[in-house]
Design a protein with these regions (language model features):
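Donor nucleotide-sugar binding/catalytic pocket of nucleotide-sugar-dependent glycosyltransferases
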Residues: 122-161
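Conserved donor-binding/catalytic core segment of Leloir-type glycosyltransferases
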Residues: 5-6, 163-194, 203-205
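A short, well-ordered alpha-helix in the C-terminal region of glycosyltransferases
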Residues: 298, 305, 312-326, 333-339
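Short hydrophobic beta-strand element within catalytic cores of glycosyltransferases
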Residues: 269-272
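Short alpha-helical donor nucleotide-sugar binding micro-motif in glycosyltransferases
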Residues: 231-232, 239-244
């Protein structure tokens, strides 16, 4: 069985890439291929990032020779590509099979002139996209790249079923808060709804520009019905998800959003933009409710309709858990990843 070196964000990092690798680490395919996770980027200060990148390159020089496949989890960001490039060159020198697993969606169209990205794509043996939608976009936008492509959806760990009737009147948003994640849309929508639903509360889970959006919520008079918790993990995160009645996502750009998969595993009805790879799997009114990008009024209407219809929320909860189990379970993605490695 060919051995695989997995290169990507550090274990200690936040976000979808490290979450994806952590889930892969729990799959049988990880042991079957004697996989090793080499972290290259970490979310710390610049000196710490530099030291971490240098350490990973130093380690790669000594360990890469024992592996047959190097599986890069990456984005077209110049800094990310530069950090991973020494390891990429070592993989080429050692004649290793190279997989470029691109954690990006509609942003791909912004990188067609990125020479560094194009160079990496041409020298890879396989390009992995997060959804069929992004594979189609890639083939259209990068028609001069002849490297084969395939699709691997993100996986999500299953959680025990919980009775939706026991949920609290809470709405979650979980993100690295910035303009792309658009938490202001949820705040604007809630500003029109809070007086109608005084017994409902919004919890904003995550880091990023927290103080900016917290102040925005105060300026809107939402401080009594909106709470910014900061970044949460473990039991605390589980408690929020087990209790939530709705999860909202307002993003403009995503690859394939992990937070939606997580919500489905907990049986949380999702209200979202049709962002990233979600159009591949959206069943409107069954596993999610969608609203147009940037439209706070439409979001308010969708939230109100869902809050008012407890039966629909209960039905969506049950169906979402069944749906994610059938399409995104670790068992399903484990076999898909096994098939990818078997190509070599």
């Amino acid at each position: 069985m060919k051995k695989v070196l997995v290169v990507g964000s550090a274990r200690e990092s936040f976000g979808g890439v490290s979450s994806t690798i952590k889930l892969m680490e729990q799959m049988p395919v990880w042991k079957e291929h004697t996989c090793y996770w080499l972290g290259t980027q970490i979310q710390r200060n610049y000196l710490w990032k530099l030291w971490y990148a240098m350490k990973s390159c130093f380690m790669a020089f000594f360990i890469i020779w024992r592996y047959d496949i190097v599986h890069f989890h990456t984005v077209p960001d110049r800094i990310c590509l530069i950090i991973q490039m020494p390891i990429f060159l070592l993989a080429m020198l050692g004649k290793k099979k190279i997989i470029m697993h691109i954690h990006m969606g509609n942003q791909l169209r912004n990188h067609t002139a990125n020479k560094l990205f194009l160079w990496h794509l041409r020298h890879a043996d396989l390009i992995v996209l997060l959804a069929k939608k992004w594979q189609k976009l890639f083939l259209e936008s990068y028609s001069n790249i002849k490297t084969p492509t395939t699709v691997l959806y993100n996986s999500c760990a299953m959680t025990p079923h919980s009775d939706y009737a026991n949920r609290k009147n809470t709405i979650l948003m979980m993100a690295y808060f910035n303009d792309n994640k658009a938490p202001d849309l949820l705040l604007k929508a809630w500003q029109t709804l809070q007086s109608r639903y005084p017994d409902w509360h919004i919890y904003m889970l995550g880091n990023g520009e927290v103080e900016r959006f917290r102040q925005m919520s105060i300026d809107m008079g939402l401080q009594d019905s909106v709470t910014f918790t900061g970044y949460v993990t473990g039991k605390q995160k589980e408690e929020y998800f087990h209790n939530a009645s709705i999860l909202c996502m307002c993003s403009y750009e995503e690859g394939f959003p992990m937070v939606v998969l997580e919500a489905w595993t907990y049986g949380i009805p999702v209200v979202t933009t049709p962002v990233g790879g979600l159009p591949d799997v959206i069943e409107e009114g069954r596993n999610c409710v969608t609203f147009p990008f940037g439209d706070a009024d439409a979001l308010a209407d969708k939230l109100a309709a869902l809050i008012d219809n407890e039966q629909q929320r209960s039905d969506m909860s049950a169906y979402s858990q069944e749906f994610v189990r059938n399409h995104f379970s670790p068992e399903k993605i484990n076999q898909d990843l096994r098939n990818i490695y078997a190509r070599f």
